[in-house]
Structures are given as structure tokens and as C-alpha cells.
């Protein structure tokens, strides 16, 4: 255990077993470089998936995922559905842990921000009375308003996920087009054009009604597309030799949405697929998933 600034960093002294649950308890008396100390014991748990460490969702549904390395994107050599802006496949290193929500922001969650006067209304005709539906027809600007409001409500920093964080979490350790097993029925994991018809009706469905991926995230494939921080790019050629903590180009006419939505085909739901839209667009198939920076606590060095 090492303290640096206001963070306590746990580095295993030996390799951890994969697919195991571990518990860590820190006793009183540990002091960081600023002189802050624990006045009581602290305990956390996590499980390992490959070289990735995750912690169970907190009461808000936020899941802590360690940093790690993965192959981002897709190309026609490995995926016949790959589009030009998904390649080349390249190595990405995420150095820091981050929280990501296990669900898309709901109408109820977004309505609280609207009622507080900090978020503007979604596009007309989409603001359902069903508070457990994911909020849709919100722009990238509105998604950021929501994250900023969440930050103002607690001593926690909420934000949109980077595109790399999103894909890392959506893939959940897989290298296949979707994060569910290849022999699984996609309809068990996603709302998309094959199961969002009569008698189900059309439109987004209540969050967390399908199976989650291996990291515990629901609806990363289908239901709604999700805004991420990044400006869009024509491809990943600038990152072809590998990159650490990428945040996309510095400027572009569009932002990126990920994940596919309820009336799109399976190929649009692939983990690597990304769709550009202007940041003021309020599209019926786009919603929000948020990330959060960890507070002082246990960080996991796995790379």
C-alpha cells in the first residue's frame, strides 16, 4: 500500500488469480502526504477479470473499473461489419481507474436536474412519465449539464466517459464484436430492431431489463446510443501505434455516440461502432451514461 497525494494506491505483491473476489481492509493510522488520515478502518472488495479489477456497483449504480490495456476499434480483416471510422485496431492503455454507471441515465434521474433548474428539457414528445425509462432526445450539451449538476450535488466529479473508457467497459474483456458470448442469444442482452417490434412496441425500454455484460453494465448494446466526451474523427490513424488515455481529436464538427439504439440492427450495436452527431443534436435514439472520478480511496495498479 502506497500513499500519494490524497490517494491510497494498492499494488498486489504477487499476481492475483483471475475471476476471484478479494477483500482489502485498511486499519487506522494511515496518513497521506497532506497529513490526512483515516479515523476508522476502511474495507473494499473487488473481483478480477483477466488483468482488470472491478468493484461492485455502489448505491448509485456506479462501478469502479481499474485501468488496463485493450485493443480498440475494428477493421474489415477481423470484422466484416467494421466501418472506416472504427479502424485501425490499436492498443489503448488506460492508466487510471474510473467509475462508470451500470445503466443509462433514467427519466427520473434527469427530471431531478430539470426540476432543480439546472438542466433543460429534452426534445419534445420524448419526456416519458415512466421514470425508469432511459431519458432520450438529449443533446451532448444537455448530457454535460446533467453531469455538472450531479457534481454540484456531492463532492464527486461526474462527467461523460471518454470513448476509450466507454469501449473498454463495454467490451468487458472481449475482443469479439459484442460483449455477450458468441453462442448467446443477442435478444437476451439488448433491445434492438429484432425484439423492439410488436408486441413489444417501439421506443426505449426500462433500463436493466436485459442481461449485463461481464463488468456488470446493462444496455451497452442497444436501447439508446450514449454520448461520450470525444470529438469525432474519420478514423484512428493518429493512434495507430498505440496510445495512453486518449481523448480524441482537439476539434471537430461532431461528437461521438456509442452503443446503438432500439431500432437499429445488430451491427450498429457492436462494441467498436461509433456514430458522429453535432453536440446540439437531440436525437430520439441517443441518451446518457456517465462516468465519475474516484475519490480518495483504493486505486488498483494492474498494468
Language-model-derived ranges and their functions:
Residues 72-81, 92-185, 229-237, 292-296:
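Active-site microenvironments of metalloenzymes and redox enzymes
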Residues 52-67, 71-72:
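GGW-centered surface loops in extracellular recognition modules
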Residues 2-4:
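Blade-terminus and WD-like Trp-Asp/Gly-His loop motifs, strongest in beta-propeller folds
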Residues 30, 46, 65, 70-72, ...:
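Bulky hydrophobic/aromatic "packing anchor" residues in well-ordered structure
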Residues 96, 187-221, 248-251, 275-280:
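Short, well-ordered junction/capping motifs at the entry into regular secondary structure
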Residues 78-92, 174, 182, 203, ...:
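Surface-exposed recognition segments
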Residues 8-9, 16-18, 23-53:
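Acidic, Ser/Thr/Gly/Pro-rich low-complexity segments and short DxT(G/T)-type signature motifs
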Amino acid at each position: 500500500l502506497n500513499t500519494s497525494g490524497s490517494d491510497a494506491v494498492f499494488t498486489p505483491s504477487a499476481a492475483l488469480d483471475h475471476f476471484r473476489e478479494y477483500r482489502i481492509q485498511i486499519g487506522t493510522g494511515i496518513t497521506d502526504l497532506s497529513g490526512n488520515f483515516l479515523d476508522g478502518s476502511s474495507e473494499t472488495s473487488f473481483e478480477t477479470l483477466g488483468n482488470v479489477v472491478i468493484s461492485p456497483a455502489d448505491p448509485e449504480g456506479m462501478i469502479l473499473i481499474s485501468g488496463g490495456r485493450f485493443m480498440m476499434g475494428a477493421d474489415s480483416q477481423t470484422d466484416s461489419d467494421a466501418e472506416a471510422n472504427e479502424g485501425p485496431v490499436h492498443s489503448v492503455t488506460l492508466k487510471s481507474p474510473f467509475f462508470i454507471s451500470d445503466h443509462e441515465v433514467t427519466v427520473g434521474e434527469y427530471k431531478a436536474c430539470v426540476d432543480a433548474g439546472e438542466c433543460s428539457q429534452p426534445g419534445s414528445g420524448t419526456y416519458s412519465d415512466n421514470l425508469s425509462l432511459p431519458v432520450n432526445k438529449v443533446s451532448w450539451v444537455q448530457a454535460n449539464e446533467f453531469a455538472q449538476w450531479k457534481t454540484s450535488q456531492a463532492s464527486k466529479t461526474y462527467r461523460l466517459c471518454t470513448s476509450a473508457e466507454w469501449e473498454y467497459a463495454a467490451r468487458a474483456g472481449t475482443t469479439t464484436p459484442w460483449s455477450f458470448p458468441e453462442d448467446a442469444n443477442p435478444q437476451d442482452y439488448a433491445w434492438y430492431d429484432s425484439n423492439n417490434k410488436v408486441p413489444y412496441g417501439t421506443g426505449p425500454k426500462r433500463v436493466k431489463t436485459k442481461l449485463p455484460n461481464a463488468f456488470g453494465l446493462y444496455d451497452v448494446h442497444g436501447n439508446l446510443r450514449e454520448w461520450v466526451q470525444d470529438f469525432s474523427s474519420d478514423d484512428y490513424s493518429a493512434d495507430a501505434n498505440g496510445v495512453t488515455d486518449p481523448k480524441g481529436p482537439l476539434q471537430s464538427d461532431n461528437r461521438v455516440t456509442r452503443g446503438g439504439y432500439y431500432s437499429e440492427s445488430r451491427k450498429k450495436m457492436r462494441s467498436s461502432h461509433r456514430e458522429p452527431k453535432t453536440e446540439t443534436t437531440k436525437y430520439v435514439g441517443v441518451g446518457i451514461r456517465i462516468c465519475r472520478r474516484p475519490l480518495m480511496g483504493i486505486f488498483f495498479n494492474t498494468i
